[in-house]
C-alpha cells in the first residue's frame, strides 16, 4: 500500500514538469516570426562612403561636351534629345537635378551616407545634389508622382557557405521604377520615365584594412536605350562624417 501511494505521489509531482516540458516543446515547434531585413542583413552597408573615380573620368569629373555619347547604347530618339541639351534651360525650368536621379546619382562624385530609416528601409543620402533614396524591403512605396529617385524595392542576396555552415555573406539588390525622366550623364544623355534601374551593392574588406563598396548599376529603357547600360562605381569607407558637405544640383 505504501509503495502504491508513493507511486501516485511521484506521478502527481512529475506532472507539472512533464506539462511544462510539453508546453516548451509545443512553443518550440510553432513557426517563429521572420527576422526583419535589418536583423537578417548578411552584410553591413551603413556608414559614410566616398566615391573613388578610377574610370570614365571624362564623363564623371567634368561635364562632357555636347555630342560625347561614347559607350552609351542610345536610340535615335535619345540622340535627338541629347543634341538639344541646354543646361541654362534646365536650370530655368527647375530641372537642374536631371543628372542626379536614380539612373545616374551613384556615378556623381562625392560622399554617400547609408543608414537604416527603420527595420525595413535602407536610406541613402548623397552629398551631390542633396538627394535621398529609400530602399524598401518587401513592399515598394505606393505609386505616386514620378520623382528623381523613384520607388525602390530591395532584397538581400545571400551567398551560400559550405554544407551545414551559415551563409558566407551576401549583397543587396535594388530595383527602381517610377522615375522622373533624367540624364545618364550631365551632357544631356537621357533616360525616360519608363526606365528601370537595377543595382547591386557589394561590400569587400581588403587585407590592408580598407573597406570598399562596389555599386553595379544596370539601366534599361525602351525609349532611349538599345540595350542595357551597365556601370560600376567604387566607394571607400570613411571613418566618420566630419567631411560631409551636401551641395545643390548643378545643371552644368
List the model feature ranges, each with a label.
Residues 1-5, 9:
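N-terminal low-hydrophobic presequence detector
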Residues 2-3, 25-252:
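PEST-like low-complexity, intrinsically disordered acidic/proline/serine-rich tracts
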Residues 8-19, 23:
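Bacterial N-terminal signal peptides
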Amino acid at each position: 500500500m505504501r509503495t502504491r501511494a508513493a507511486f501516485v505521489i511521484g506521478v502527481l509531482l512529475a506532472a507539472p514538469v512533464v506539462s511544462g516540458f510539453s508546453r516548451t516543446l509545443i512553443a518550440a515547434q510553432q513557426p517563429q516570426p521572420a527576422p526583419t531585413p535589418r536583423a537578417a542583413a548578411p552584410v553591413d552597408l551603413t556608414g559614410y562612403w566616398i566615391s573613388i573615380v578610377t574610370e570614365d573620368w571624362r564623363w564623371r569629373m567634368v561635364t562632357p561636351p555636347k555630342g560625347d555619347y561614347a559607350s552609351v547604347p542610345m536610340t535615335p530618339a535619345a540622340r535627338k534629345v541629347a543634341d538639344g541639351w541646354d543646361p541654362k534651360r534646365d536650370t530655368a525650368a527647375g530641372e537642374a537635378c536631371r543628372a542626379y536621379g536614380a539612373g545616374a546619382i551613384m556615378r556623381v562624385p562625392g560622399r554617400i551616407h547609408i543608414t537604416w530609416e527603420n527595420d525595413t528601409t535602407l536610406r541613402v543620402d548623397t552629398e551631390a545634389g542633396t538627394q535621398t533614396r529609400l530602399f524598401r524591403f518587401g513592399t515598394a512605396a505606393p505609386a505616386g508622382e514620378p520623382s528623381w529617385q523613384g520607388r525602390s524595392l530591395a532584397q538581400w542576396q545571400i551567398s551560400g557557405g559550405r554544407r551545414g555552415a551559415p551563409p558566407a555573406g551576401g549583397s543587396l539588390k535594388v530595383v527602381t521604377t517610377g522615375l522622373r525622366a533624367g540624364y545618364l550623364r550631365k551632357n544631356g544623355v537621357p533616360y525616360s520615365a519608363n526606365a528601370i534601374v537595377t543595382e547591386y551593392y557589394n561590400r569587400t574588406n581588403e587585407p590592408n584594412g580598407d573597406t570598399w563598396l562596389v555599386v553595379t548599376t544596370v539601366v534599361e529603357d525602351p525609349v532611349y536605350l538599345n540595350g542595357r547600360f551597365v556601370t560600376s562605381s567604387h566607394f571607400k569607407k570613411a571613418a566618420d562624417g566630419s567631411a560631409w558637405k551636401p551641395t545643390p544640383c548643378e545643371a552644368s
